[in-house]
């Protein structure tokens, strides 16, 4: 019997079966997760953490592209985004930090009929303010 073909479409939040029950992180959340794991390993090995080239590059990537640099700012971002969005949309909004609603809708098409421009812009403005005033 032929298997059904799953048509992926991020605009409709059809991300594939492997993503159905998984959480999605912003780059800032992933940065905190990696930092926490590395700190735990440092405590367990008296400060000596063997880092592969991949891990070094991953940490460097997070340091460059994480929009929220501290745990406090990242948690504040989570609070701003709340549960209004699908986990994929939340991760994208928190990672991309779009300047305006039009940009957000272009980059995250699934937002099209979910929230009006005024409310979306308000959320984006809160994220922008948070980025400016993070520690």
From Swiss-Prot:
UniProt-listed InterPro entries: HRDC-like_sf, RNA_pol_Rpb4/RPC9_core, Rpb4-like, Rpb4/RPC9, Rpb4/RPC9_sf
Location(s) in or outside the cell: Nucleus
Keyword hit for Acyltransferase: no
Similarity section: Belongs to the eukaryotic RPB4 RNA polymerase subunit family.
Listed GO biological process terms: transcription by RNA polymerase II; transcription initiation at RNA polymerase II promoter
Chief location bin: nucleus
UniProt keyword annotation of Transmembrane present: no
GO MF assignments: nucleotide binding; translation initiation factor binding
Coiled-coil region list: none
Protein name: DNA-directed RNA polymerase II subunit rpb4
One Gene Ontology cellular component annotation held by this UniProt entry: nucleus
Quaternary context: Component of the RNA polymerase II (Pol II) complex consisting of 12 subunits. RPB4 and RPB7 form a Pol II subcomplex.
Biological role: DNA-dependent RNA polymerase catalyzes the transcription of DNA into RNA using the four ribonucleoside triphosphates as substrates. Component of RNA polymerase II which synthesizes mRNA precursors and many functional non-coding RNAs. Pol II is the central component of the basal RNA polymerase II transcription machinery. It is composed of mobile elements that move relative to each other. RPB4 is part of a subcomplex with RPB7 that binds to a pocket formed by RPB1, RPB2 and RPB6 at the base of the clamp element.
Alphabetical keyword list: DNA-directed RNA polymerase, Nucleus, Transcription
Transmembrane segments: none
PANTHER family, A to Z: DNA-DIRECTED RNA POLYMERASE II
Source species: Schizosaccharomyces pombe (strain 972 / ATCC 24843)
